[in-house]
């Protein structure tokens, strides 16, 4: 089984497959080609058909900045997955030096094809929950101990970063007003809901409003392309 790092990821909304995945792919490519003159990205399948609404081109352009990037939107899907794209890299002579095929396969996970293809490392010997529960019972350990037994030494620090990102998205969403970007112009309500909770006397109603305001805060941050 893969590391829990593959489950918990920090990225931008509104979609793990249409923004978080493409952002991770762009970051990886930029690390390999920091001196590129420009990039051109062919968005295929679902990334092309719904990419504008999901801010796919926006997050790729933001990630590659200040290096310029242009886009082609192609409705045909690539062979492996509906969320595919091809990134063309151009050197300082404006000659294409590489074309990288990459897929955003869900949950922020990405898959490169060809010589950049990598598979997540297996860090757990057990393959399913039944095997895990049997193992922890035999060893007399908790699930938390089981995780620490298998993950690397920096995993607890990683979890604190994830927790901090969760709190930050709530706090950020509670501070903002106005409308969410996009044609629907949906009004943000988390801040007003939080203020309503503060002024509610009945404890059960107050707690329900607080919880709802936190949920709306994260949802609105996600929809508006914020970090979650």
Regions found by a protein language model. Name each.
Residues 157-228:
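Accessory "access/gating" subregions that flank catalytic or transport cores
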Residues 44, 55-145:
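Mobile "lid/hinge" segments at catalytic clefts and subdomain interfaces of large enzymes
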Residues 19-22, 26, 53-57, 80, ...:
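Generic structural signal for well-ordered, non-membrane alpha-helical segments
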Residues 1-3, 33-37:
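N-terminal glycine-rich anion-binding loops that anchor highly charged ligand groups
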Residues 36-45:
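Beta-strand segments within the central parallel beta-sheet cores of soluble alpha/beta enzyme folds
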Residues 8-26, 222-228:
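Conserved phosphate/anionic-ligand binding catalytic regions in large, soluble enzymes, centered on
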Residues 131-166:
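N-terminal amphipathic, basic-rich helices that act as targeting or association modules
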Residues 22-29, 60, 64, 215-218, ...:
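Buried hydrophobic packing segments
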């Amino acid at each position: 089984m893969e590391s829990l790092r593959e489950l918990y990821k920090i990225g931008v909304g509104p979609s793990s497959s249409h923004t978080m995945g493409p952002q991770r792919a762009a970051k990886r490519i930029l690390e390999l080609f920091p001196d590129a003159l420009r990039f051109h990205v062919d968005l295929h399948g679902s990334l092309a058909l719904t990419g504008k609404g999901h801010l796919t081109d926006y997050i790729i352009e933001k990630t590659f900045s200040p290096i310029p990037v242009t886009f082609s939107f192609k409705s045909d899907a690539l062979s492996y997955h509906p969320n595919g794209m091809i990134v063309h890299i151009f050197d300082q002579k404006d000659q294409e030096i590489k074309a990288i095929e990459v897929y955003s396969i869900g949950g922020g996970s990405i898959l490169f094809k060809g010589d950049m293809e990598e598979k997540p490392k297996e860090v757990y010997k057990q393959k399913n929950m039944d095997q895990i529960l049997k193992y922890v019972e035999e060893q007399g350990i908790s699930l938390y101990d089981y995780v620490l037994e298998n993950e690397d030494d920096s995993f607890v620090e990683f979890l604190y970063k994830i927790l901090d990102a969760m709190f930050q998205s709530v706090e950020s969403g509670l501070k903002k007003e106005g409308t969410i970007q996009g044609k629907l112009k949906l009004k943000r309500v988390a801040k007003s809901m939080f203020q309503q909770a503060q002024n509610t006397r009945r404890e059960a109603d107050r707690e329900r409003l607080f919880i709802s305001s936190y949920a709306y805060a994260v949802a609105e941050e996600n929809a508006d392309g914020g970090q979650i």
